[in-house]
Design a protein with these regions (language model features):
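Residue-level hotspots at or immediately adjacent to binding/recognition sites across diverse folds
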Residues: 1-112
């Protein structure tokens, strides 16, 4: 596992080969979240009532409290994502920085 976040009274963790697990009891036990994602996920965050996970050529987004995640394929790899002041910010290979307000549409930051 590579990343973990807390939001809406639950923990989510992500890892290799699309691994996505959650805990609804403060980490005492974990269950696998059904997902079609097969690419590695490196980080996940909660903000704007949305969970956003990032990884190898992919972004996953949940707007229904983590019940389902939609995969958005990318041409770039994000290694980490955070949320603050209403914006998701992701960083990745080749020193890229992207921002998004919803996790779906990403804008490259020039220059950094």
């Amino acid at each position: 596992l590579y990343g973990i976040t807390f939001g809406n009274n639950q923990f989510f963790s992500v890892g290799s080969s699309g691994k996505l697990i959650k805990s609804i009891n403060n980490g005492s036990s974990w269950s696998t979240v059904d997902s079609t994602v097969t690419k590695s996920l490196y980080s996940i965050v909660f903000g704007n009532s949305t969970f956003v996970g990032v990884g190898y050529l992919t972004v996953i987004v949940s707007t229904d409290n983590g019940s389902t995640f939609t995969e958005k394929e990318n041409t770039y790899t994000f290694n980490d994502v955070t949320f603050g002041n209403g914006v998701f910010v992701a960083v990745g290979d080749n020193e890229i920085i992207y921002t998004s307000t919803d996790g779906d549409d990403w804008t490259k930051v020039y220059p950094w």
